[in-house]
Amino acid sequence: MTEGAITEGRDAIQDLRSHPAAHSDLAQLLTATGQDLARAPDGKGSPVIFRVAVEGERQDLDPIIQDEAYRIARELLRNAFRHAQAGQIEAEIRYEDSTFRVRIRDDGKGIEPEIVKAGGRGGHWGLLGMRERAKQIGAQLEFWSEAGAGTEVELSIPSSIAYGAARRGRFRLLTRKKTNP
């Protein structure tokens, strides 16, 4: 129990200290995070195969949305590497016209339905914190899990929110160029 509290405290401090650059690519950030977690010196289990897949044409994300999406995905990756006992973990980023999606999936032991429904285990704030972050940015966070069949979690953000500020900024630049001779 003490070790868990220390780990959660260390993660909270890292969250406060780490701010991904607004112009960093989300796929690169998640790749680096997954590689770091795969190298974690816990010595438990066999190596995990980790990959990041990107679908669709990359679009600039609103910097706040990108930061929150990264923080949620990072927490999901931490949970998968620490608790799933998975052989494979994948992060999938999908740039769609109507929705921006980030999915984290593993082939591990799964999460008990009661834990997902309750929003987490007593004394643990990871699932609850991710749901709150998602809600604050107008996103949905959905969990699918079966005992022994792994877990998949999807963060979905409407494109008007995910790409909104970036698109509006480009429009302002285009408008400004047209009005200035």
Question: Where are the regions that the model predicts?
Answer:
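Coiled-coil dimerization/phosphotransfer module
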Residues: 1-181
